[in-house]
Amino acid sequence: MDEKSNDRIRVMEIVSRSQYNDEVIDQVDMSDLDLSFSDLSFSDLSEVMARRIMAKRVVLRASSLMRAAFHDCDFELADFRSCNLEEINMADCRFGEADFSKANMKYAKINISSCFETRFDEADFSHGELVGTILNHATFRHANLSGIDAEQADCTGTDFSGANLTNSKFEKAHLENVNLSAVDARNANFTEADFTGAILLNGDFTEADFTGAKLDNVVWTGANVEGAKFDENVKEQVLKII
């Protein structure tokens, strides 16, 4: 049996014991188990609870982590592609350059975390939470973010092109230089958000709320703002450049 297989067995023993005893996995240094390069694809990690674990570059592709909970963990460069992360709760974690493409993230929470250059392309993150999370230069291309709560999130340079943002909440979010091309953002709440330099090309912002938002140097070409709310006299200026 090779070393990677041994690492997988040892990790799954820890996980199974945690699941069976309903215990929190606390401060496990996964680097000692060489988990940084382990492949845990297709594993069942549902309802696991863990804090302060190191899991850089771990491969969890197509695994189930439904209703799992992670606090103060490091998942930089981790592979979560096509995972079932429904109702997962993650806080104060690091996901730099991790990949959540095509993951099921309905009702998932990634709050007060760091997701620098993280990929969420085509993920279903509907009704989830990204409150206070850093998402600089992350990508959500064609993702479903309907009903997401991203209040005070830092999305500077983030790519949401083609995403579903209907009924989403981005109050006081940093959206500088964000790409919102061709998004469906009907009824979205952008109150007091900073859109400086953002691209809203061909987006649907029907009934969206931009009250108090900073809108300097925004590209509005082709955008639909029918019924959208703006500060006094702002909508007239926007309509002139669409």
Spans of model-derived segments:
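Tandem repeat scaffolds
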Residues: 2-242
